[in-house]
Amino acid sequence: MAEEQVLNTHNASILLSAANKSHYPQDDLPEIALAGRSNVGKSSFINTILGRKNLARTSSKPGKTQLLNFFNIDDKLRFVDVPGYGYAKVSKSERAKWGKMIEEYLTTRDNLRAVVSLVDLRHAPSKEDIQMYDFLKYYDIPVIVVATKADKIPRGKWNKHESVVKKALNFDKSDTFIVFSSVERIGIDDSWDAILEQV
């Protein structure tokens, strides 16, 4: 079923930003969290699959997202953009604070249905990417791995890069893996299929 028949994906807005659970929305709408390294393309992913240009702000300055940003989609679903990890210029104490905030959300939020874990298709996953995937598997949280920036690689090499990413993550075949490009609009339907399957 096409996503337009399920919900109007263009009817989306940023709802609120939260530093801890006391600020989370108090209802039972399903939520999909988005996690990934700084500058992996989370904001571009959100904007692309929602068909909006600047709903999630893209930044040339990594580490800009410092709160959990909740996006309301047609009053039926929420995306939760979590702070990008792996940015060296953020202080150790700040990184620890973000880590605690992300962990609290991922392990205690009943609304959470799945996590879209974004990785860069061009490179082997970072230590933080692997830690995030392992964390989600440990807590039995459904994972959708989205490999971004596919347009930067010739199509003939996608399978090779996908294999490298999956091997490094020790990828569970029961999870979903999607090759994605915001520039070429590749992987949008597959992403929605995977998301809606979880909600």
From Swiss-Prot:
Necessary for normal cell division and for the maintenance of normal septation. It comes from the Bacteria. This is Probable GTP-binding protein EngB. Residues 28-199 form the EngB-type G domain. It comes from Streptococcus pyogenes serotype M49 (strain NZ131). GO terms for molecular function: GTP binding; metal ion binding. The lineage of its organism: Bacteria, Bacillati, Bacillota, Bacilli, Lactobacillales. Keywords: Cell cycle, Cell division, GTP-binding, Magnesium, Metal-binding, Nucleotide-binding, Septation. One of its GO terms (biological process) is division septum assembly. GO terms for cellular component: cytosol. The keyword Cytoplasm does not apply.
